A protein has these predicted regions:
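Histone-fold recognition with a strong bias for associated Lys/Arg-rich disordered tails
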Residues: 1-174
Length: 174
C-alpha cells in the first residue's frame, strides 16, 4: 500500500491533542488525547462523536478519571505513545483501503474504534457507546455525497437503535 499523507486537519488535530495533554499535565499524547481533540473537530468525526453525546467536557472528565491530573507547571517532554502512533499509522491504512486522497481525522477515528486495547476505545465503551456504532457512522460520513444521501435515513436509525445519547442519560441521572 502506498503511504498516505496526513491532511492539514489531522496534523492540526494532533497538535490540539498535545495541547490537551499539556493542559492535563500529562507527559505523553495518548489515544485519549486524540479522542478529546476529535470531539472538538469541525468535520464529520467530531459531529459523529457529538451526536453520540460525547462532548469535550464529558470526555475530559473521563480522561481525568482514568489518568488523573498531572503537573501543569513542569516542562513535560511530549510525544505520541506507541498506541497513538499506531493509531495514526492505522489511519493511513484506513485511508488507503478507502482510496482517499489523504489521511483525515475521520480515518483516525476509524482506526481508534478498531483498536479495542487503546484508551480511547475503552473510554467509548465505558461511556456506554459501542465503538462499532462510531465506526459505522464515521464510515458512512466518508462515503460519496450521493451514497450518503441514500443511506442517511438508515444510518440515523442505526445510531438511534444501537447508541445511547449520553446527554439524555446524564439528564436522567443514570
Amino acid at each position: 500500500m502506498k503511504k498516505q499523507e496526513l491532511s492539514g486537519r489531522l496534523r492540526g488535530l494532533i497538535v490540539q491533542a498535545g495541547r490537551f495533554a499539556r493542559e492535563l499535565g500529562h507527559s505523553y499524547v495518548g489515544t485519549e488525547h486524540l479522542l478529546l481533540a476529535l470531539s472538538q473537530e469541525a468535520g464529520s468525526a467530531g459531529r459523529v462523536l457529538r451526536a453520540a453525546g460525547l462532548e469535550e467536557p464529558c470526555l475530559r472528565s473521563m480522561v481525568l478519571a482514568g489518568a488523573g491530573l498531572g503537573s501543569r507547571t513542569l516542562f513535560l517532554p511530549q510525544g505520541l505513545t506507541p498506541r497513538a502512533r499506531r493509531a495514526v499509522h492505522q489511519a493511513g491504512v484506513e485511508a488507503s483501503r478507502l482510496k482517499t486522497g489523504g489521511v483525515t481525522p475521520e480515518h483516525l477515528l476509524l482506526a481508534l474504534t478498531r483498536d479495542d486495547g487503546c484508551t480511547a476505545c475503552r473510554i467509548l465503551k465505558g461511556s456506554g457507546i459501542e465503538p462499532d456504532c462510531i465506526f459505522t457512522e464515521t464510515f458512512g460520513a466518508l462515503r460519496t455525497p450521493e451514497q450518503t444521501q441514500q443511506g442517511r435515513q438508515t444510518s440515523v436509525r442505526l445510531l438511534e437503535q444501537y447508541c445511547e445519547n449520553m446527554i439524555e442519560k446524564a439528564a436522567r441521572m443514570e
